Amino acid sequence: MRTTYDFAPLWRSTIGFDRLFDLVDAAQQAGTEDNYPPCNVERLSEDRYQISLAVAGFSADEIAITAEQSVLTVEGRKSEKQQREFLYQGISSRPFKRQFNLADYVQVKGASFDNGLLQIELVREIPEAMKPRRISISGSSASNVRQIDGKAA
Protein backbone atom coordinates (compact mmCIF):
# COMPACT_ATOMS: atom_id res chain seq x y z
CA MET A 1 0.00 0.00 0.00
CA ARG A 2 1.38 3.34 -1.01
CA THR A 3 0.82 6.59 0.87
CA THR A 4 0.54 9.84 -1.05
CA TYR A 5 1.30 13.22 0.45
CA ASP A 6 -0.23 16.55 -0.47
CA PHE A 7 2.51 19.20 -0.47
CA ALA A 8 0.22 22.00 -1.75
CA PRO A 9 -0.08 23.84 1.63
CA LEU A 10 3.70 23.87 1.95
CA TRP A 11 4.15 25.13 -1.62
CA ARG A 12 1.86 28.12 -1.02
CA SER A 13 4.18 29.49 1.65
CA THR A 14 7.40 29.29 -0.35
CA ILE A 15 8.77 31.46 -3.11
CA GLY A 16 11.58 30.53 -5.45
CA PHE A 17 11.68 26.81 -4.72
CA ASP A 18 9.46 25.72 -7.63
CA ARG A 19 12.17 23.58 -9.24
CA LEU A 20 12.92 21.81 -5.96
CA PHE A 21 9.27 20.88 -5.45
CA ASP A 22 9.00 19.73 -9.07
CA LEU A 23 11.85 17.30 -8.39
CA VAL A 24 10.17 16.03 -5.21
CA ASP A 25 6.90 15.58 -7.08
CA ALA A 26 8.66 13.76 -9.94
CA ALA A 27 10.42 11.43 -7.49
CA GLN A 28 7.11 10.64 -5.81
CA GLN A 29 5.47 9.79 -9.14
CA ALA A 30 8.41 7.72 -10.39
CA GLY A 31 7.20 4.61 -8.57
CA THR A 32 3.74 4.77 -10.13
CA GLU A 33 4.88 5.54 -13.67
CA ASP A 34 4.90 2.85 -16.33
CA ASN A 35 8.41 2.23 -17.68
CA TYR A 36 7.36 0.49 -20.88
CA PRO A 37 9.03 0.29 -23.35
CA PRO A 38 12.52 0.06 -21.90
CA CYS A 39 14.92 2.75 -23.05
CA ASN A 40 18.50 4.00 -22.91
CA VAL A 41 19.62 7.63 -22.90
CA GLU A 42 23.20 8.04 -24.15
CA ARG A 43 25.59 10.96 -24.46
CA LEU A 44 27.38 10.56 -27.79
CA SER A 45 29.51 13.71 -27.48
CA GLU A 46 29.48 17.03 -25.63
CA ASP A 47 26.34 18.28 -27.42
CA ARG A 48 24.85 15.10 -28.96
CA TYR A 49 22.51 12.63 -27.25
CA GLN A 50 20.52 9.58 -28.30
CA ILE A 51 17.41 7.97 -26.86
CA SER A 52 16.95 4.29 -27.78
CA LEU A 53 13.63 2.52 -27.16
CA ALA A 54 13.11 -1.24 -27.48
CA VAL A 55 9.82 -1.47 -29.39
CA ALA A 56 9.91 -5.03 -30.70
CA GLY A 57 6.70 -6.04 -32.43
CA PHE A 58 5.86 -2.50 -33.59
CA SER A 59 6.42 -1.11 -37.06
CA ALA A 60 7.55 2.43 -37.85
CA ASP A 61 4.06 3.51 -38.93
CA GLU A 62 2.58 2.43 -35.57
CA ILE A 63 4.83 4.84 -33.64
CA ALA A 64 4.42 8.62 -33.37
CA ILE A 65 7.12 11.01 -32.13
CA THR A 66 6.19 14.58 -31.20
CA ALA A 67 8.30 17.37 -29.72
CA GLU A 68 6.38 20.19 -28.08
CA GLN A 69 8.28 22.92 -26.23
CA SER A 70 10.59 20.98 -23.90
CA VAL A 71 8.77 17.62 -23.89
CA LEU A 72 9.47 14.76 -26.28
CA THR A 73 6.60 12.25 -26.52
CA VAL A 74 6.82 8.80 -28.09
CA GLU A 75 3.52 6.96 -28.55
CA GLY A 76 2.85 3.54 -29.99
CA ARG A 77 -0.37 1.72 -30.77
CA LYS A 78 -0.41 -1.71 -32.37
CA SER A 79 -2.89 -2.09 -35.20
CA GLU A 80 -4.25 -5.62 -35.19
CA LYS A 81 -5.11 -6.57 -38.72
CA GLN A 82 -6.17 -10.07 -37.94
CA GLN A 83 -7.03 -12.05 -34.85
CA ARG A 84 -4.34 -14.54 -34.00
CA GLU A 85 -4.40 -17.31 -31.47
CA PHE A 86 -1.31 -17.32 -29.27
CA LEU A 87 -0.29 -20.31 -27.21
CA TYR A 88 2.17 -18.01 -25.42
CA GLN A 89 2.62 -14.28 -26.01
CA GLY A 90 5.91 -12.94 -24.66
CA ILE A 91 6.27 -9.95 -27.00
CA SER A 92 4.15 -7.15 -25.65
CA SER A 93 1.96 -5.26 -28.07
CA ARG A 94 0.17 -2.98 -25.62
CA PRO A 95 -0.12 0.72 -26.39
CA PHE A 96 2.43 2.98 -24.75
CA LYS A 97 3.29 6.62 -24.21
CA ARG A 98 6.73 7.71 -22.97
CA GLN A 99 7.60 11.33 -22.28
CA PHE A 100 11.06 12.82 -21.89
CA ASN A 101 11.72 16.30 -20.51
CA LEU A 102 14.33 18.01 -22.66
CA ALA A 103 16.80 20.55 -21.34
CA ASP A 104 16.97 24.07 -22.71
CA TYR A 105 18.20 24.38 -26.31
CA VAL A 106 17.94 20.62 -27.00
CA GLN A 107 16.45 19.90 -30.43
CA VAL A 108 15.31 16.62 -31.99
CA LYS A 109 17.38 16.10 -35.15
CA GLY A 110 15.92 12.83 -36.39
CA ALA A 111 14.79 9.31 -35.67
CA SER A 112 15.52 5.89 -37.13
CA PHE A 113 13.88 2.51 -36.68
CA ASP A 114 15.81 -0.71 -37.23
CA ASN A 115 15.43 -4.26 -35.87
CA GLY A 116 12.84 -3.26 -33.25
CA LEU A 117 14.98 -0.43 -31.89
CA LEU A 118 13.81 3.18 -32.21
CA GLN A 119 16.68 5.67 -31.98
CA ILE A 120 16.04 9.40 -31.56
CA GLU A 121 18.94 11.79 -32.12
CA LEU A 122 19.10 14.96 -30.02
CA VAL A 123 21.45 17.94 -30.34
CA ARG A 124 21.99 20.79 -27.92
CA GLU A 125 22.40 24.04 -29.87
CA ILE A 126 23.12 27.02 -27.65
CA PRO A 127 22.45 30.34 -29.43
CA GLU A 128 25.51 32.50 -30.12
CA ALA A 129 24.18 35.22 -27.83
CA MET A 130 24.13 32.73 -24.92
CA LYS A 131 27.64 31.30 -25.43
CA PRO A 132 30.46 32.65 -23.30
CA ARG A 133 32.80 35.02 -25.12
CA ARG A 134 36.21 36.42 -24.29
CA ILE A 135 36.39 40.16 -23.61
CA SER A 136 39.67 41.92 -24.38
CA ILE A 137 41.02 44.38 -21.85
CA SER A 138 42.24 47.70 -23.14
CA GLY A 139 44.29 50.24 -21.25
CA SER A 140 47.82 51.39 -20.79
CA SER A 141 50.53 48.80 -21.09
CA ALA A 142 53.79 48.59 -19.14
CA SER A 143 55.75 50.32 -21.97
CA ASN A 144 53.76 53.54 -21.52
CA VAL A 145 54.58 53.86 -17.82
CA ARG A 146 57.14 56.56 -17.03
CA GLN A 147 58.97 56.75 -13.78
CA ILE A 148 59.55 60.18 -12.39
CA ASP A 149 62.73 60.55 -10.40
CA GLY A 150 62.99 63.44 -8.12
CA LYS A 151 63.19 64.41 -4.55
CA ALA A 152 60.19 65.54 -2.74
CA ALA A 153 60.63 68.82 -0.97
Curated annotation (Swiss-Prot):
The terms describing its cellular component in GO are: cytoplasm
- UniProt xrefs under InterPro entries: A-crystallin/Hsp20_dom, ACD_IbpA/B, HSP20-like_chaperone
Gene3D superfamilies cross-referenced by the UniProt entry: 2.60.40.790
Q: Which domain of life is it from?
A: Bacteria
- Write down the CDD domains for this protein, in alphabetical order: ACD_IbpA-B_like (cd06470)
Q: Which UniProt keywords apply?
A: Stress response
Q: Where is the sHSP domain?
A: 30-140
Q: Which family does it belong to?
A: Belongs to the small heat shock protein (HSP20) family.
| PANTHER family named among the record's database cross-references | PTHR47062, SMALL HEAT SHOCK PROTEIN IBPA
Annotated protein name in UniProt: Small heat shock protein HspB
Organism encoding this protein: Bradyrhizobium diazoefficiens (strain JCM 10833 / BCRC 13528 / IAM 13628 / NBRC 14792 / USDA 110)
Lineage start: Bacteria, Pseudomonadati, Pseudomonadota, Alphaproteobacteria, Hyphomicrobiales
